[in-house]
Amino acid sequence: MLIGVPLETAAGETRVAVTPETVKKLKAQGHVLRVQSGAGVAASATDEAYVAAGAEIVDRAAALGADLVLKVRAPLADELSLMKPGGVLVGMLNPFDRDGLQRLAGAKLTAFALEAAPRTTRAALIVPAAVISIGNRRWYLSAAIITAL
């Protein structure tokens, strides 16, 4: 799967959705990773570290145009316009923001809101879960899905 990691654009945001260590793990599973140039700088991860881990360094449009886009924060309207209809978005999407949800629905994405996913062992047993690493934390993705058809 083609996975994109864009630079976070929210003021003061210093996190990145995928570290070079995570790139190695995803690459070992056969995924192709495209990281926007400078995406990890605020989190002390250089473009060179991403390349050494197996990622391609790309521009904003290429990172946002991937099949699966991993972000820390919800995308801005101009970022949504660069995302692939039918693609998947994973991140902290602020599911209580009605306007944001309307924009997501309009973009025709399947979106996983990490802050809405259960973090209990029991929930992980009930609903199949995948683990995504954001920085040094592990978040569980499950049925907290916003799907726009």
List where the protein language model places each region:
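Glycine/serine-rich phosphate-binding loop and adjoining beta1-alpha1 elements at the start
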Residues: 2, 77, 81-144
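Short internal beta-strands
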Residues: 4, 25-42
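Redox-cofactor binding/interface segments in oxidoreductases and associated redox assembly factors
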Residues: 5, 70-71, 90-91
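Glycine- and acidic-residue-enriched helix-capping/strand-helix junction motifs
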Residues: 11-20
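N-terminal beta-loop-helix "entrance" segment that forms/cooperates
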Residues: 34-56
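Short acidic low-complexity segments
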Residues: 54-65
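Alpha-helix boundary/capping motif
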Residues: 146-148
